[in-house]
């Protein structure tokens, strides 16, 4: 049976992740409050930020930037968008 969470991003009960995606308190908070579906959406957002901003993941500043963005994405109303990004029409 899948673990269910009340997803803070989707505002509904959904399947939770199997393990914390990040270490520390932020990882625990995400594991408890974010669904697999919402995490997959974040990974797409993160990929756009890395590519559009040409982030070097070996640079500690780039990793810190993404940690701040993931926290903003789920818990503070939204992360930065890639410049020029236009969401697909539904």
Curated annotation (Swiss-Prot):
GO terms for cellular component: cytosol. The keyword Iron applies. It holds the Pfam family Iron_traffic. InterPro entries: Fe_traffick_prot_YggX (IPR007457), Fe_traffick_prot_YggX_sf (IPR036766). One of its GO terms (molecular function) is iron ion binding. One of its GO terms (biological process) is cellular response to oxidative stress. Keywords: Iron. The keyword Transport does not apply. Could be a mediator in iron transactions between iron acquisition and iron-requiring processes, such as synthesis and/or repair of Fe-S clusters in biosynthetic enzymes. Belongs to the Fe(2+)-trafficking protein family. This is Probable Fe(2+)-trafficking protein. It comes from Polynucleobacter asymbioticus (strain DSM 18221 / CIP 109841 / QLW-P1DMWA-1).
């Amino acid at each position: 049976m899948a673990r269910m969470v009340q997803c803070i991003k989707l505002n509904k009960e959904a399947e939770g992740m199997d393990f914390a995606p990040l270490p520390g308190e932020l990882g625990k908070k995400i594991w408890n409050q974010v669904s697999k579906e919402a995490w997959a959406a974040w990974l797409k957002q993160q990929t756009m930020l890395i590519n559009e901003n040409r982030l070097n993941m070996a640079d500690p500043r780039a990793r810190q930037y993404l940690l701040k963005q993931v926290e903003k994405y789920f818990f503070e109303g939204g992360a930065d968008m890639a410049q020029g990004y236009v969401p697909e029409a539904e």
